[in-house]
Curated annotation (Swiss-Prot):
Residues passing through the membrane, by range: none
Tissue specificity statement from the Swiss-Prot or TrEMBL entry: Expressed by the venom gland.
Organism taxonomic ancestry: Eukaryota, Metazoa, Ecdysozoa, Arthropoda, Chelicerata
Primary location group: secreted
GO-annotated biological processes: defense response
Location in the cell: Secreted
Top-level taxon in the UniProt lineage: Eukaryota
Entry protein name: Toxin NaTx-4
Organism whose genome encodes this protein: Centruroides sculpturatus (Arizona bark scorpion)
Disulfides per UniProt: C12-C63, C16-C39, C25-C44, C29-C46
Function: Probable sodium channel inhibitor.
Keyword Disulfide bond applies: yes
Keyword Disulfide bond: yes
Domain LCN-type CS-alpha/beta: 1-64
Domain characteristics, as noted in the entry: Has the structural arrangement of an alpha-helix connected to antiparallel beta-sheets by disulfide bonds (CS-alpha/beta).
Amino acid sequence: KEGYLVNKETGCKLACVTTGENKNCKLDCKNQGGSKGYCLLFRCFCEGLSESTPTFPIPGKTCSGK
């Protein structure tokens, strides 16, 4: 599974500043069980996640426009 990492409480995608290779996104992705993480459109994108890992969008969470 792949997708944008998400804050489970707010429903918002995890933000990043440096597009492309990004150590924070890579670490966050690894912590979620993913194989690769990088910054895509200023949000952390992850590959190799398990199907049970929440990614954006989370049903019922609107992110309050963030």
